[in-house]
Amino acid sequence: MVMGTPSSLDEIRKAQRADGPAGILAIGTANPANHVIQAEYPDYYFRITNSEHMTDLKEKFKRMCDKSTIRKRHMHLTEEFLKDNPNMCAYMAPSLDARQDIVVVEVPKLGKEAAVKAIKEWGQPKSKITHVVFCTTSGVDMPGADYQLTKLLGLRPSVKRLMMYQQGCFAGGTVLRLAKDLAENNRGARVLVVCSEITAVTFRGPSDTHLDSLVGQALFSDGAAAIIVGSDPDTSVGEKPIFEMVSAAQTILPDSDGAIDGHLREVGLTFHLLKDVPGLISKNIEKSLDEAFKPLGISDWNSLFWIAHPGGPAILDDVEKKLGLKAEKMRATRHVLSEYGNMSSACVLFILDEMRRKSKEDGVATTGEGLEWGVLFGFGPGLTVETVVLHSVPV
């Protein structure tokens, strides 16, 4: 047996790695055609769940919807389907089979819609895709949604797949962190990332003893987003980054046990939220910013462009207040919350898309609202925070 010399191993490792940072080369989004107008939703929700007798609770839910700052949400579940599946409309009735039957089919399908758009924008043959990262909080099967997507798109059978289930709202940051490592450590890699979320697993009727469940019913919605990530873009074929990823970190916030919990049981996926989630995030967010931007010598948070998971308006309000952010910093985030609701892991990718679109429309110098450096935050169960440092590119 011939042992390789350290120098030759070093050379092999160096040759395997990319030279430059991972960049987001394309973005695509998709939503179910069915949508609800938030102002009309309380009447619809209490009618479809046979809960119109719960008048006080309905008034509370109306106030939640009013405060949500959401205008509309897309949902796969239609009134006709819910009428045919009354157990999904009860508060805690066994209904997992019906829910799973929907999402194991529809999550990959919605993901495919977003992926097709991203691949079209990228402009390269899909045979160049080397890795697939698929993320969803909805539905678990083997083989998983990553396999189904690979088949639906007709990707090469040798594509390297990674499936992320049950991560929750912070996972839009997680997929970027993983895709960054894959792209930078595998020369020539092109990573297709898909986040696809359908609320069929969480929809249920109201309960006057579990108001935290109602919060989710007022916020959550359906959507899928896809990106292509790669290092060393091939400009000869038109590849160009929209944003570059500089660093990525994950942390569990102190004293946050039980702040956000999700449990997949016979009744579907139930979420439990403590009231102090906005306070926990805002109290700890500056530490994450300091750690991420100290190497760059940046401490003025208003000098950054912002992509924050819109868990709800209270989180955004508290973060703005704590950091002294100007109102326009969260414009793209609040726009996505208003037009789409909380689509869990897909949200931050929608916000990236909205930011690059508006930056071009406004004629500013960069994809990051004219600014050079930016931050992307994911918040979710744990309480877990993902922090991604982004670098914009000229428009």
From Swiss-Prot:
GO terms assigned for molecular function: naringenin-chalcone synthase activity
TM region positions: none
Active site: 169
List of residues that carry N-acetylvaline: 2
Keywords: Acetylation, Acyltransferase, Flavonoid biosynthesis, Transferase
Gene3D superfamilies in alphabetical order: 3.40.47.10
EC number, UniProt record: 2.3.1.74
Its biological purpose: The primary product of this enzyme is 4,2',4',6'-tetrahydroxychalcone (also termed naringenin-chalcone or chalcone) which can under specific conditions spontaneously isomerize into naringenin.
PANTHER family: CHALCONE SYNTHASE, HYDROXYMETHYLGLUTARYL-COA SYNTHASE
Family per similarity comment: Belongs to the thiolase-like superfamily. Chalcone/stilbene synthases family.
Name of protein: Chalcone synthase 3
Species of origin: Sinapis alba (White mustard)
Gene: CHS3
